[in-house]
Every structure is written in structure tokens, then in C-alpha cells.
Amino acid sequence: VSDHPTDFVGSVEEAITSSLKAKMPDAVVEVSGGGGHYKIAVVSTAFAGKSMLESQRLVLSTIKHLINGANPPVHAVDSLTTRTP
């Protein structure tokens, strides 16, 4: 169990993936990184008709609980790729 207010169990990568799949069930999610810095790639129909910025905002708003706070497990998303299938 993490010491972050979200109290997720498992790795940060698993927490990111499960959060995104809860919001976008059809999503194919790839997360890599560590030390608070992560690369995220998401393929989902949820991005259809959205601009790149809108798609990236959707992803970041979905994982904001892992980014915000005094000692967040995610300090930076170094790369974020969003695509439709």
C-alpha cells in the first residue's frame, strides 16, 4: 500500500493503467518509467473527434489524483501519446 492519499495497492504503473481503464474501458494502455517519471501511451475510441490537447487533458485529468498532493507518486509525465484505434 502506498503512503499517498489515494492508497492504491500495487505499482504506480498499475495504478495509472487501472485509472485509465476505469475511465476508458476499451483503452489499450502502456506505461513505463519509474522514480516518479512516466511515459504513457493510450489508444482509445474516447479520443475520436478530440484534438491532441483535448485527448491529453482527458488522460491527465483521469490520473490527477496520482499527480497532486504533498508526495505524489507521479512527479512528471515525460511523454504522453494518445491515439484512436
Residue locations for each model-derived region?
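N-terminal presequence-like segments and adjacent domain-start helices
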Residues: V1-V12
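Short edge beta-strands and adjacent turn/loop segments
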Residues: A22-K39
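Active-site phosphate/pyrophosphate- and oxyanion-stabilizing loops and adjacent acidic/basic residues
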Residues: S18, R57, S61
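Histidine-centered active-site/metal-ligand motif
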Residues: H37, Q56, H75
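Solvent-exposed beta-strand sheet faces enriched in polar/charged residues
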Residues: E30-S32, A41-V43, T81-R83
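Short amphipathic alpha-helix segments
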Residues: V12-L20
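C-terminal structural segments of small proteins and small subunits
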Residues: L60-P85
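A short interface-forming secondary-structure element
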Residues: A41-Q56
